[in-house]
Amino acid sequence: GFFATAAAVVMAKGVPVFCDVDESLHMDPAKIEALITPRTVALAPTHVMGSVCNMHAIMEVARRHNLKVVEDCAQSCGGKVNGSYVGTFGDVGIFSISAYKIVGGGEGGLLITDDERLWDRANCLSEGGGLWRPERFAPPRYEGELFCGTNYRMSELEAAVDVVQLSKMPETVARFRTVKRQITGRLKTYREIRPQTMNDPDGEVGYTLRFFPETIELGQEIAKALKDAGIGAGIRGRNGRPDWHIYHDMYPITLKTKSGADDCSFHCPHYAAKGGKIEYRLGDCPVADDLFDRVVNVGLNQWYTEEDCVQFADVMNSVLSHFCTEDPSAKPWR
């Protein structure tokens, strides 16, 4: 995921707890329950780099423990899980429309929900605590409706741009999926490489191709060779620079800093009174630590032609065959 998801928890006066991942590089449903305490109020599965979480398993855990679910769909807008769009499983789905996302329209984002009370609260937060209502200055229509909100909202001009951009989303996602399938369908399999596990191969957006060489050093060599051959590949872990896409480098979180003037999140007396105390350490999420250091990320372009895809796959096969051993029985690309 990215730091922003955890930061949103702190801004809401909460304390984020990180869950480890599996080979899909998404929240591992099997590891959620061990992290749940009487203080847990919500799960925040994050759909990353065009792929999707195992939402059915996550929702089962949430229902069993009566927890809210907030889906962070910023990096996978248009993705699906078993035919249903990401963002429609949880209580709230959150999307980003910043310039470098799948659907870009400036800055900011949007949310969706089928809970009318949550929808009212979102509107109160974005427009003065209640000014959006038909009778702007009326008393509360029900207990708890009004609170001191803000004016966190995009401009009318940006909203108009975003409406048009969102209308293009299905075609954009379809192009990415076609490109990735044309490439992965031509890639050979290798003993020393495990492609990322896909929770829904047909539902992912498909703008990245990710795989795990068996060692960090092999990953570094492959990434460099791919770049030298003209393919946009890279690694994020063990490159000598901190990265706010991995929990232990999210310094505003790990250092337990404030959000705003007060100190009511990590150091809240109410949190402490309920037995709350958290420390963030390297090794808290060992699978994430391992995979993040080894994963090679390859970016794809929605405008690749079929000829481009053939050439792309040929170059990848050439590079991978130089470093790895072909093995038809190895894990296939998806």
Identify the residue ranges that each predicted region occupies:
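Active-site region of PLP-dependent enzymes
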Residues: 76-82, 89-208, 215, 242-243
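Short, conserved charged micro-motifs
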Residues: 216-222, 305-311
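PLP-dependent aminotransferase-like
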Residues: 1-73, 80
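Conserved PLP cofactor-binding pocket of PLP-dependent enzymes
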Residues: 130-140, 182-185, 223-295, 324-334
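Short beta-strand segments
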Residues: 44-46, 96, 196-197, 207-213, ...
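Basic phosphate/pyrophosphate-binding loop/patch that engages nucleotide-derived ligands
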Residues: 36, 59-68, 105, 110-130, ...
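Proline-centric
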Residues: 20, 297-305
